Amino acid sequence: QMCIRDSRYSDDYTSAYYYPDLSSSIKNATLAITAVENQLEAATTTAHEKEFFPNVKQFARIWRAYLISEFVDNFGPYPIESFLGENPVFNSEKDDYEFILKELKEAAAAINTSVLPVEAEGKCDPFDNVKYDPVKWQKYANSLRMRLAMRLSNIDKATAQAEFEDAAKGNKILTADDMFAVKENDGWDVFSGVYTRSFDDQVLSSTVANLLTNLGGIKVTEQRSDLASYVKPANYLGIKYDRHYVANTDNPTKQYWLDGMPENLDPRALKIFCLPDDENAENYIDKYNDRTAKDFVLYTVDENGNPIPNKDNPGEIKIDATRCWNGYPAGSRGGWSPTLAYNQLVTNGYGPGCTLPMLGKDYCKGKSRIFFAAWETYFLLAEASLYGWNTGTTAKEAYENGIKASFEYFGVSEYVNDYLNSTNYNRVGTSVKFDHTTEPVSYTHLT
């Protein structure tokens, strides 16, 4: 996960995704398919509509195939004959995937790419950068088919390979212009941005903090020279607070607080996340104007977790989180762990949002959200090439093109060549260079 909605545990989102979200969306997509068939028989249908509406049917089939894949992957068997006026029978997941892949193949082939929508029709596309462009929808169908075929690679490799190779022959999402993005609005309508709620901090997780640190070997000061005074040596882990953070986690940086910035960061990191109180950053947002990164403390406790000198008047360890790079420790909540009870950085309602990096302005106040990106297609091609499948490219070429596409999107292409040749390991032992296969060794960080 890239970030987490800190300190809150609920299955309400999962329940709502099952019903009404997915169920209603599949129903509406099915209705669109049948409505086209009825509309084509209407006497009022124009010559243009008789050409355009069949494409709409294919767009709806593609969209429904995606929705059904979401249902199957999240909840299990799905009834293929749903929303057709009769009580359906649930199909097996194998049958569901066969249906999904067949729908995508047939729909992509049936799109008439010479038929373009008029302006009013294009505005109806929820992917506002696509506007019912038939070629782009065809590319989405093929890239989506590649994604879903790859999911079968561990259970039905023959089917996965056949479906993938066939889809890879067609048009695919490979450029920034091809990518699908959903428009986002402020407010409370169906297009409200998923990260726009002021009560959602969307802070950096410890997992992603470890992944991005040192990956690519690009110095933070190359991007932001004004952060030089906050940068710590690459082998410095931070200050250990083993009385304030839990130990029962596999996080390699558990119980450490980095009082500054790591020397090297993936150059996309500071485009995605903004640092606490980093008002110089282009993507900075201040959700809590009356609080700062210096307003939260750790209360002093003894080796048994008892406050010092007493519960009513514990001492304080002042923390200045200004422009510091730390991730929220997954599984943390003060009510579940007495270790965290005296840690305001975690348990105070405003603590995480003020002391940890969070998704920046482009996410919280953006106008669109990427739904299917070019780099995913490239990484799918890279994985398939490693399996020896026919892809028309090599694993290395596709892998590097995927990274280049991502760097282009985030506006950091000037770093991509050095990044691609980096053999630096991040905190979980991963390096960027494709040909760098030397396994990392354990070493001790300075603290």
Predicted segments with their positions:
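Conserved small/polar residues in nucleotide/adenosyl-binding loops
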Residues: 2-7, 444-447
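Structured, solvent-exposed acidic/aromatic patches
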Residues: 5-380, 384-401, 405
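C-terminal functional modules
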Residues: 350-351, 369-378, 386-389, 404-410, ...
